[in-house]
Amino acid sequence: MTPGLRTVGVIGVVLVGLVTSQPGAAPKFSDWAIPTNLGPTINSPFNDFGAAISKDGLSLYFNSDRPGGFGGQDIWISQRPAESDAWGPPMNLGAVINTSAAESVPSLSRDGHFLFFTSTSSGGLGDRDIWVSWRDHTHDDFGWEQPFNLGPAVNSAFFDAGGSLLENDESGEALLFFTSNRPGLGGAGTFDIYVSQVAPNGLFLPATLVPELSSPASDQRPSVRFDGLEVFFYSNRVGSLGNDVWVSSRKTVFDPWSTPVNVGSTVNSASDDQQPQIAANRRTLFFASNRPGGVGGLDLYVTRRTRSEP
């Protein structure tokens, strides 16, 4: 067994301890508030997008092509002592994760041990592949180990990106949702949403199309809520002004996904709105946009909603 497969096997071991609790009744939420730009501490005159937020809300990962990186796109991190505090200056995640190629679209597992991201580095199968890294200590943002490619069950000769791991408490399954432009529902060059199940031994099973979330247009960067009842993604499907943020929901993890709906004009704009990431608290949504009034090209924004019990 290769070192990479031994590391993948850790996923199965870790998930055994994670899929034990039972979620309560699904809460209801208000509409999303007007988004706010994360400001010049986080955003730069360059492109900043692909946000990922830690479960405790204290570490914000994202990718940027700002100066000071190792390649065309690097993953950066900003930290704060408490959720009520301002974000600190972004720091490059370092040479263990970043390379002279392009690293982007980070995503953290619910337990914080795994970092999934997209890379064009050598050793991949296609244009872009999904990689994963492990850390022992979930509060050590610079403790990531050497990443490895998820292999042909997930990656292809095409563009594969935006992994989002769902650890399903009710069914005991672990599922990796991601996007790919391999031949699917759309024509050449369009993106669909796929899912790969993690087997009990930690290995990924061959990915399959998620038809409820895919369309003849491009559907990208799924972000699955940790309880599995909502998935956010961005799309240029009919009903979008360009690239818009969309959402699909379901009552239980055993139900099919609902027909996706546009999250609306409060969040989306006539510009390019993309790369959504739903936080663990289920009330905070990060995304990127190049709408007027930003700091650079693509900027990071946040919108919030309040919770009201059924």
Give residue spans per PLM region.
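Bacterial N-terminal signal peptides
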Residues: 9-19
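Bacterial N-terminal signal peptides that target proteins for export
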Residues: 1-10
